[in-house]
Amino acid sequence: MFERFSAVAKAAVTQAHKQARELRSPVIDVEHVLLGLLAVAEPALREVFAEAGVTQDDVRARLAERGAAAPLGEHDAEALRSIGIDLDAVRASLEASFGEDALERSVPEPRRGLLARIGHTPLTREAKKVIELSLRETLARKDRVIDAAHLALAVLCAPNSGTAEILGGDEAIARLRPRVTALLDRAA
């Protein structure tokens, strides 16, 4: 299937892999595909997302923030406070004893074998679905090549909950889809 991907669409998937690794994610999720798209897409496609308030820097910052807060978030801190445990004090004590990075999520352990040698990070089921939907979008439009905009349509068609939140919810997604489709129509 990847032989049908344009150079930009391939670069977006490659960039998704790179971003997932940099953000210390053990998997490539839909959010990483969106981030990869925003990193390499044509200016017109990036502009469509930027007008909706979705930029590469914003998505990356939100993913980094989510990753940093993932082990124990604010709700967990409140629950622990209710039983007399100050999570901030525990964190400070651990960082004082073991260093500032003591609570950082470690870089995922590389797999062994052939996949490890090529630096493979697996796609989540949702991210795989987005890749497959990009092919379906291409076929439905009778286009020959899967481009970044097809990948964007697939993200908009099947966002996971995190991606939907980043994109601004269902209404924002509904407004983005025709704008991305219009880009493809102009290119055809």
Language model region names:
Residues 1-188:
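Histone-fold recognition with a strong bias for associated Lys/Arg-rich disordered tails
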